[in-house]
Amino acid sequence: MQARYSVSSPNSLGVVPYLGGEQSYYRAAAAAAGGGYTAMPAPMSVYSHPAHAEQYPGSMARAYGPYTPQPQPKDMVKPPYSYIALITMAIQNAPDKKITLNGIYQFIMDRFPFYRDNKQGWQNSIRHNLSLNECFVKVPRDDKKPGKGSYWTLDPDSYNMFENGSFLRRRRRFKKKDAVKDKEEKGRLHLQEPPPPQAGRQPAPAPPEQAEGSAPGPQPPPVRIQDIKTENGTCPSPPQPLSPAAALGSGSAATVPKIESPDSSSSSLSSGSSPPGSLPSARPLSLDAAEPAPPPQPAPPPHHSQGFSVDNIMTSLRGSPQGSAAELGSGLLASAAASSRAGIAPPLALGAYSPGQSSLYSSPCSQSSSAGSSGGGGGGGGGGGGSSSAAGTGGAATYHCNLQAMSLYAAGERGGHLQGPAGGAGSAAVDDPLPDYSLPPATSSSSSSLSHGGGGQEASHHPASHQGRLTSWYLNQAGGDLGHLASAAAAAAAAGYPGQQQNFHSVREMFESQRIGLNNSPVNGNSSCQMAFPASQSLYRTSGAFVYDCSKF
């Protein structure tokens, strides 16, 4: 008798029932030697006992292969192809794309060893499939090639019978009448084809309606390829002769133009150090560079106040990611600015989540600097607003922390004269106009002090705050990165209204727990929730919103 008893590895001897000292000794020796049990005549009678033979059937005895029936090799497994697929393979493999029945049998047996057995069963199925399926056509044999048996070939309409050329998946059962019907439809479509290019060109001027409320600009009558390229959701509108920074710097809500073409805004933002007004240098980057530049179309303020619905944002997001994101960036700046001036809360901006605006997540200062670009010029609320934004405008082009810090320190120095005038509303309204990760306008400046120094004093009209939260909680930046920003904010607060320092510290105490829980940086005075409060008492009523806001992230 051969040993029916085996273990999968020498170390797993615990599987074996204990059979007495002598046998366990032999077992251990055999395992150590890596040999089989047949070398030991003594225990053999024990192992070949019928009970053990049943307990450890042959399926477990693979460790000692020679003594067990060999498992089926892989090619003996039935191939996953249907008989239709097998016949199709054989026909397509034949030189003339036609083959006899015997040729089909031979091809299948050569290719798939599984079919070398039980020939009668599967060959019957092959014949059955050949006669039953309309995709296989019998071609009578001509006299040039003597022999017996007709040729089989594929119906020309059935070549796309399998999905993506994979024989594993068939689209549907091929029927001749369906194929004829499809052919007729194709013929009809072919006759009607000349008009469709016209129809394809019609929608090009339509996107102004798609983006709700965007100012429809004059379209040049000949539709060129550049326009059609941008047709997928963004508006291929006439180029604006102003860059976003210069356009937003125009100062009053009524004349803030909607930056429509994504390429104009993205090109001017990406042109790095070009000064705000020098659009001609940035313009060649855009898609429709050849277009003549008509005068800018000022959008009416109502558009901005009701402006950015989710549909609008999503349609513009569908365009080229980089361009539309930049468009959203600048467009939202304008809309937030105007709507905050009109006293309407801008909805939560989805621009920050757009895939193209990777710059938002790439560096701590990028978001606030782009905000600064619009912010600065847009609200001529007191001379201070203008100068802080002048630094911010450069920041938009270069996305640089230094400019951000400069604007902070500048704002700190002029903090005193910024807080007072109602014009502060204007500059504040535009100073931080991206309400990216924050609640609506009530949450004025939980971290606006971190993004713009002036923001602390002017925050009574901020649409919402950002940058501080975004930087430390979204990017998990260490507090040290924000150190100079926060200290500058504190300086701004001190310069603006030293009398409120006690409130400042008490509020900071209130946020201690959130800072511990949410901030990766060590808990220090300059952590992310630090707030520089303006003189208006209205802010303190919304501290509940701040607590919610902090814990939310």
Curated annotation (Swiss-Prot):
Changing S521A: No effect on sumoylation. The modification Phosphoserine is found at S237, S243, S274, S320, S521. DNA-binding transcriptional factor that plays a role in a broad range of cellular and developmental processes such as eye, bones, cardiovascular, kidney and skin development. Acts either as a transcriptional activator or repressor. Binds to the consensus binding site 5'-[G/C][A/T]AAA[T/C]AA[A/C]-3' in promoter of target genes. Upon DNA-binding, promotes DNA bending. Acts as a transcriptional coactivator. Stimulates Indian hedgehog (Ihh)-induced target gene expression mediated by the transcription factor GLI2, and hence regulates endochondral ossification. Its main location: nucleus. Residues 77-168 bind DNA. It comes from the Eukaryota. SUPFAM superfamilies: Winged helix' DNA-binding domain (SSF46785). Residues 373-393 have a biased composition (Gly residues). It is found in: Nucleus. Disruption phenotype: Embryos die pre- and perinatally with haemorrhagic hydrocephalus and calvarial defects, beginning at 13.5 dpc. Mutants that survive to later stages exhibit multiple craniofacial and vertebral defects characterized by disorganized rib fusion, absence of chondrocytes proliferation and ossification. Show abnormal cerebellar development with an enlarged fourth ventricle roof plate at 12.5 dpc and a disorganized cerebellar rhombic lip. Phosphorylated. Phosphorylated on Ser-274 in response to epidermal growth factor (EGF) in a ERK1/2 MAPK-dependent signaling pathway; phosphorylation contributes to its protein stability and transcriptional regulatory activity. Pfam families: Forkhead. The gene is Foxc1. This is Forkhead box protein C1. Keywords: Activator, Angiogenesis, Developmental protein, DNA-binding, Nucleus, Phosphoprotein, Repressor, Transcription, Transcription regulation, Ubl conjugation. Monomer. Interacts with C1QBP. Interacts (via N-terminus) with GLI2 (via C-terminal internal region); this interaction is direct and increases GLI2 DNA-binding and transcriptional activity through a smoothened (SMO)-independent Hedgehog (Hh) signaling pathway. Interacts (via C-terminus domain) with PITX2 (via homeobox domain). Interacts with FLNA and PBX1.
